[in-house]
Amino acid sequence: MDDVIRVLILKDGLTLISKIEEVSEFEIGEPNCILVDPMLIDVEKDYENGLTRYPDQRITQEKKMMILSDNILTMVVPHPKLLSEYLVQIS
């Protein structure tokens, strides 16, 4: 199965790029989206310097995080150059 990688703009204004997995069984109000290898995008910087792991490794070593899809304002397909840099940085 191919990874689904998207740019997510969250309601709090953060912009992330991440692999996304859907949770098949969940309770209403519980997280229903898994982000794998999420990275924060600093839109003021170029792709090489504008991606940082999210949350920071000083906070957790986990590479997966669950969120409510309600926290996502929109999702878009990443620009090919952004996708390429993301794949380099997570490998």
Language model feature labels by segment:
Residues 1-91:
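Conserved RNA-binding domains used in RNP assembly and mRNA/RNA metabolism
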